[in-house]
C-alpha cells in the first residue's frame, strides 16, 4: 500500500473511532440526565376528599429511606436532598408567581372558622429525622423502630382566592401526639387561608426543630415545582412557626431560622437564640406540666424585637385546646397573631399592640409586652 493509501486508511479509522466515542458519551449523558431527573421528581399532593376533607397524597419519586432524603426536591442549591446536615437549605424562593401576589388579606374574625373550605393531605413530603429506636441523636419518633414519619398538610381547598399568595405555618406536636390531636386548630388556620405543614413525628425530634424546618423546606420546594398543586401559590416571605409543649420547645429553637417571620410557642417556650421576628409566648395559668417560667424567661431575654408574654389564667396543659363547636379563646388569639404578622391584618393589630391592647384589658389574660408600643 502506498503512503497516500495508508494516510487515507488511518484518517478513516480515526473518524470511525471518534464517532463511536461521541455516541457513547451522548448515551451516558442521557442516562445520567434521566437518572437525575427521576431522583429530583416529587409527586404533587393530590386533591382532598370533599366528603371527609382528607386524602392520602401520592409521593411518587420521593426517594430516601431510613431518614435519608436523597433525591427529594430536585437538584441544585435549593434541594433538601442528601444528608441531614443539609436540612436547613430551602428550595427556590418565589414570593410571587404566575398564580398569586403577596398582599394584605381581607379582614376576618379570628375567633370563628374562616371563609375557606379546607383539605387535609396525609403522609406527604419527605421523611424528617430518625425514627424512635433507630439510633442517632434526637430521634423523631413515630410508628415504631425504623419508621420515619412524614407530614400532614392542611390547606384551603381553593388556592389563591382573590389572587393572594398563602402564608405558611409550620407546626410541631407535643410529646406522643400527632397532628390529628391538634386538627381543630390547624384546620382553623387553613380555613383562614394559611397553608400548614405539620410533622407527623410524635416526638418532634425530642424538642429539636429539624422536622419543622424540613417541613418549610418541602413546601418551598412545592411552590417552585410546576407539577405541584402548591406551585406559585405560597407567600414564601411570610412563614410562621408554632407548636405545643415539646413542639413549643422546637418552635423556640426554629425561631432562629431566617425564613421564619414570627413564632408562637404554646406551653413550652424557651429562650430563643437569634430571634429576628415578633414572638407570642403563650402559657396556661393552671399548667402543672411545664408551667410559665420558660415563657417568662424567654420574654426577659428579648431586647429589641416585639414580644408578648400571654398567660391565659384558666387553662392547663391541655384544656386550651377545647373546641365545642367554635374555636377556643386561645385558638382565636393565636390565629389573630398569625393574621396580623403573616397576612397584614391591621384590624387585629390592636389586639396585641399598645398599652391598652385588647388582650391587655381582658381579665382572663395576664399580659406582658416588650417593644409593642405601636
Model segments located where?
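Gly/Ser-rich "nucleophile elbow"/oxyanion-hole loop immediately N-terminal to the catalytic nucleophile
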Residues: 160-165, 207-249, 347
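Active-site-adjacent alpha-helix of alpha/beta-hydrolase-fold enzymes
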Residues: 275-344
Amino acid at each position: 500500500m502506498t503512503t497516500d493509501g495508508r494516510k487515507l486508511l488511518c484518517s478513516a479509522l480515526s473518524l470511525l473511532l471518534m464517532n463511536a466515542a461521541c455516541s457513547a458519551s451522548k448515551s451516558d449523558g442521557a442516562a445520567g440526565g434521566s437518572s437525575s431527573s427521576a431522583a429530583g421528581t416529587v409527586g404533587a399532593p393530590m386533591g382532598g376528599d370533599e366528603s371527609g376533607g382528607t386524602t392520602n397524597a401520592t409521593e411518587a419519586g420521593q426517594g430516601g429511606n431510613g431518614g435519608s432524603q436523597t433525591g427529594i426536591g430536585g437538584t441544585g442549591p435549593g434541594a433538601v436532598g442528601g444528608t441531614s446536615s443539609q436540612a436547613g437549605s430551602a428550595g427556590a424562593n418565589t414570593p410571587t408567581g404566575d398564580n398569586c401576589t403577596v398582599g394584605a388579606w381581607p379582614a376576618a374574625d379570628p375567633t370563628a372558622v374562616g371563609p375557606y373550605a379546607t383539605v387535609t393531605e396525609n403522609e406527604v413530603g419527605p421523611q424528617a429525622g430518625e425514627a424512635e429506636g433507630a439510633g442517632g441523636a434526637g430521634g423523631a419518633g413515630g410508628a415504631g423502630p425504623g419508621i420515619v414519619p412524614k407530614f400532614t398538610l392542611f390547606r384551603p381547598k381553593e388556592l389563591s382566592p382573590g389572587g393572594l399568595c398563602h402564608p405558611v405555618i409550620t407546626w410541631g406536636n407535643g410529646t406522643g401526639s400527632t397532628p390529628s390531636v391538634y386538627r381543630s386548630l390547624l384546620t382553623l388556620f387553613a380555613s383562614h387561608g394559611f397553608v400548614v405543614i405539620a410533622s407527623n413525628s410524635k416526638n418532634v425530634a425530642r424538642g429539636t426543630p429539624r422536622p419543622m424546618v424540613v417541613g418549610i423546606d418541602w413546601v418551598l420546594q412545592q411552590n417552585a415545582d410546576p407539577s405541584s398543586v402548591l406551585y406559585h401559590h405560597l407567600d414564601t416571605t411570610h412563614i410562621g412557626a408554632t407548636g405545643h409543649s415539646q413542639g413549643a420547645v422546637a418552635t423556640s429553637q426554629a425561631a432562629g431560622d431566617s425564613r421564619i417571620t414570627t413564632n408562637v410557642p404554646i406551653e413550652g417556650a424557651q429562650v430563643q437564640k437569634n430571634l429576628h421576628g415578633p414572638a407570642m409566648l403563650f402559657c396556661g395559668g393552671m399548667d402543672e406540666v411545664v408551667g410559665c417560667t420558660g415563657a417568662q424567661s424567654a420574654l426577659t431575654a428579648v431586647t429589641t424585637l416585639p414580644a408578648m408574654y400571654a398567660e391565659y389564667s384558666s387553662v392547663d396543659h391541655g384544656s386550651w385546646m377545647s373546641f365545642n363547636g367554635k374555636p377556643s379563646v386561645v385558638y382565636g388569639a393565636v390565629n389573630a397573631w398569625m393574621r396580623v404578622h403573616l397576612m397584614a391584618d391591621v384590624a387585629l393589630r390592636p389586639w396585641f399592640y399598645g398599652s391598652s391592647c385588647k388582650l391587655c384589658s381582658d381579665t382572663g389574660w395576664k399580659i406582658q409586652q416588650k417593644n409593642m408600643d405601636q
